[in-house]
Amino acid sequence: MTELDSLWEAIQNSFRQDTTPVTFDTLIAPAKAISLSQNQLEIEVPTPVHRDFWRKNLNTQLKEFAQRELGRNIEPHYVLEGEFTYTNKKTEDDPTPSFEMDTPLNPHYNFGTFVVGEGNKMAHAAAFAVAESPGSLYNPLFIYGGVGLGKTHLMEAIGNHMLQVNPNSRVKYVTSEDFTNDYINAIRNNTTEQLREEYRNLDLLLIDDIQFLANKEGTQLEFFNTFNALHDRKKQIVMTSDRIPNEIPELQDRLVSRFRWGLTVEITPPDLETRIAILRSKVEEDHIDIGNDTLNYIAGQIDTNIRELEGALTKVQAFANLSGERITPSLASQALKGLHRVAKNEISIATIQKQVADFYNITQGDILGKKRVKQIVMPRQIAMYLSRELTDSSLPKIGNEFGGKDHTTVLHAIDKIETELKKDTDLQNDITKLKAKLRS
């Protein structure tokens, strides 16, 4: 086996263990190693989407892995199938071929610019599978989660990918409010047949914030018939919502039933590693000079959603520009100070105790009590940790709120959770979800 074959086999095996089967099969396995020189690994990928995904999500891991395996620095170089980099002078920085769009999709919302993490990897894999084979795998695809977590990005990425593969595809992106207005205007102008012609002959319908169809009986009926017409013709439907179908109030049972025909996937708030990766991607894209220590600090302060995370980065940039100072963790702390004082004051220790108890299916009395069973001790320690993180309370104050416990008990709980967070991804996700609930 050659050095190239050995390296590539090891790389593929490593990525296979670290990603979901769908992500590996659709985005990683199709790539091929073409050549290996002293300091460059040339990798062939089938589409620009694959190329962008490797660059954004796998590049750093690949270089670190190659360094360990070969003992030298290797720079990955990505080429499209049939693209000969040295004879036709194309480079990996060539722009993605343009395509015509007759639908208002944001071209920035593509799979290459989507940062994959623990909280969104299933949704990302499902979205890419749908984009590769619309109408056949998961139809409909229903993506749900909180505000600012990337649902619209993934939805529009499906549309952009489909138009890139086939510019003649009939793709339509609308919010549920747009659909409602189209329906009302069609009734008012006696153009319902034109409306149905427009919507029921699509190849892909993307409808955002479907929960706002609640309480609109006429619109729900029209969408029900549109859904059936598209699904019967094996045309893809993708929807987003802030909750699962059966939790949308006043949504007709027949719609709930049809929304469940395909696949429902959740996007949760990004964990710390994903937040750092999102910030790093943003500063690289915007050519901003910010050190990793500062990015790590910002990512540690904002754990609600991506919009607030990028907003915090913008605030730090503005603070630096106005003050004329270099961006450092200290400056970032000053820039974000007011933001977190407001957030902390809105959350009480009692609220934290109740949310943690509900999350782990125990009682608030268990949190305040003295039982030492693991199922109660860990949630109690988490509640103490969050009380320190999300309020301005002192250790003695927190101890008093937890049934009169000593401040050293609180300190031990905080240290315990901080230690576990460094190695326990399940705990990281639990903490992220709890913080999101408490701040929502």
Swiss-Prot record:
Residues 1-72 are annotated as: Domain I, interacts with DnaA modulators. Its main location: cytoplasm. ATP binds at residues 148, 150-152. The keyword Metal-binding does not apply. The keyword Cell cycle does not apply. Pfam families: Bac_DnaA, Bac_DnaA_C, DnaA_N. It is found in: Cytoplasm. One of its GO terms (molecular function) is ATP binding. Residues 72-103 are annotated as: Domain II. Residues 321-440 are annotated as: Domain IV, binds dsDNA. GO terms for cellular component: cytoplasm; plasma membrane. Keywords: ATP-binding, Cytoplasm, DNA replication, DNA-binding, Lipid-binding, Nucleotide-binding. InterPro entries: AAA+_ATPase, Chromosome_initiator_DnaA, Chromosome_initiator_DnaA-like, Chromosome_initiator_DnaA_CS, DnaA_C, DnaA_dom, DnaA_N_dom, DnaA_N_sf. Gene3D superfamilies: 1.10.1750.10, 1.10.8.60, 3.30.300.180, P-loop containing nucleotide triphosphate hydrolases (3.40.50.300). Coiled coil: none annotated. Residues 104-320 are annotated as: Domain III, AAA+ region. One of its GO terms (biological process) is DNA replication initiation. Belongs to the DnaA family. Plays an essential role in the initiation and regulation of chromosomal replication. ATP-DnaA binds to the origin of replication (oriC) to initiate formation of the DNA replication initiation complex once per cell cycle. Binds the DnaA box (a 9 base pair repeat at the origin) and separates the double-stranded (ds)DNA. Forms a right-handed helical filament on oriC DNA; dsDNA binds to the exterior of the filament while single-stranded (ss)DNA is stabiized in the filament's interior. Oligomerizes as a right-handed, spiral filament on DNA at oriC. Domain I is involved in oligomerization and binding regulators, domain II is flexibile and of varying length in different bacteria, domain III forms the AAA+ region, while domain IV binds dsDNA. This is Chromosomal replication initiator protein DnaA. It comes from Limosilactobacillus reuteri (strain DSM 20016) (Lactobacillus reuteri).
